[in-house]
């Protein structure tokens, strides 16, 4: 693993020509870095995560309530449909990651934060504080929606994630694991130092695939769970709706994303970045020398 003083060089082939793009491959984040608590940059990042998650919950939950309200009162063909809901979630994440990426990293999701922690990209201190800020922002965002449209909010489920009829808890858990894996895997790939160095002249290439990942996962899992893949989003809606239906299977929307995030981090580091092969090679070399 390169130190901050070392610069790795990647060769990028394009047609007949090859260009070299320098990139930083930062060392693993320390597990406990209490020095962060004395830095304004941490608190600025927490505010950014709080506000971004608040905005995300406001837009996404309002879209879900609006869609259900249209479906219940008028011809379903006049509503936004699953496609519109998925676009709302994906496009909002794209915008918010673009806006906050330079301040906090634009996580807006405890699963993303935990995935980066598992990948040694964040300290435990920053991870815990990010998750708290995201959950508080989600509750505030859902609260704004409920304040604006209280009657349809209460009547139409509050945008809370539930296991749909015809699906088992195990199936819903599997959908959440796979969906979160896709999202966090995309985050790791989009923010990989090699890729960002090569594509740094097109900054939109980082939030764009992340937004599309959210979009396609929603298309696949809205019929199953309403699509969680974000524990803060599920928590915010459940707290404000606060009915048995919202809490009955709420554990799925924490356990699934955490498992999916861990698997994505392991896949990226051990397979795509080749750390498993490097560790095995180092072990063999040590054994031969001994």
UniProtKB/Swiss-Prot annotation:
| An example molecular function term from Gene Ontology annotations | water channel activity
PROSITE patterns tied to this protein: MIP
The compartments listed are: Cell membrane
* Summary of the tissues where the protein is detected: Expressed in roots.
Q: Which Gene3D superfamilies match?
A: Glycerol uptake facilitator protein (1.20.1080.10)
Q: Which InterPro entries match?
A: Aquaporin-like, Aquaporin_transptr, MIP, MIP_CS
**Where is the motif (NPA 2)?**
230-232
The membrane spanning regions, by residue number, are 45-65, 79-99, 128-148, 168-188, 202-222, 252-272
Does this entry carry the keyword Transmembrane helix? Answer: yes
Q: Where is this motif: NPA 1?
A: 109-111
Q: Does the keyword Cell membrane apply?
A: yes
- Cellular component terms per the entry's GO annotation: plasma membrane
Q: Which domain of life is it from?
A: Eukaryota
Mode of membrane association: Multi-pass membrane protein
Q: Which UniProt keywords apply?
A: Cell membrane, Membrane, Repeat, Transmembrane, Transmembrane helix, Transport
Give the similarity note: Belongs to the MIP/aquaporin (TC 1.A.8) family. PIP (TC 1.A.8.11) subfamily.
Q: What is known of its domains?
A: Aquaporins contain two tandem repeats each containing three membrane-spanning domains and a pore-forming loop with the signature motif Asn-Pro-Ala (NPA).
Role according to the record: Aquaporins facilitate the transport of water and small neutral solutes across cell membranes.
What's this protein's name?
Probable aquaporin PIP2-7
């Amino acid at each position: 693993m390169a130190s901050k003083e070392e610069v790795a060089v990647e060769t990028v082939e394009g047609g007949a020509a090859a260009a070299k793009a320098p990139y930083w491959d930062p060392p693993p984040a320390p597990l406990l870095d209490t020095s962060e608590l004395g830095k304004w940059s941490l608190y600025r990042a927490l505010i950014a995560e709080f506000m971004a998650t608040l905005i995300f919950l406001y837009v996404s939950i309002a879209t879900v309530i609006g869609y259900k309200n249209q479906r219940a009162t008028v011809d379903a063909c006049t509503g936004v449909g699953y496609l519109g809901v998925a676009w709302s979630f994906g496009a909002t994440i794209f915008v918010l990651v673009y806006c906050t990426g330079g301040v906090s990293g634009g996580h807006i999701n405890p699963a993303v934060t935990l995935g980066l922690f598992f990948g040694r990209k964040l300290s435990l201190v920053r991870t815990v504080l990010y998750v708290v800020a995201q959950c508080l922002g989600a509750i505030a965002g859902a609260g704004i929606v409920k304040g604006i449209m209280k009657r349809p909010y209460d009547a139409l489920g509050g945008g809370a994630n539930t296991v749909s009829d015809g699906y088992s808890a195990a199936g819903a858990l599997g959908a959440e694991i796979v969906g979160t894996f896709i999202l966090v895997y995309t985050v790791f790939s989009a923010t990989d130092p090699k890729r960002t160095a090569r594509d740094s002249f097109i900054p939109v290439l980082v939030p764009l695939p992340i937004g599309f990942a959210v979009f396609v996962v929603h298309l696949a899992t809205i019929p199953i769970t309403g699509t969680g893949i974000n524990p803060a989003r599920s928590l915010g809606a459940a707290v404000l709706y606060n009915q048995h239906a919202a809490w009955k299977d709420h554990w799925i929307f924490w356990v699934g994303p955490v498992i999916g995030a861990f698997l994505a981090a392991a896949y990226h580091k051990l397979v795509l970045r080749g750390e498993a092969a490097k560790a095995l090679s180092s072990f063999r070399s040590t054994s031969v020398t001994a």
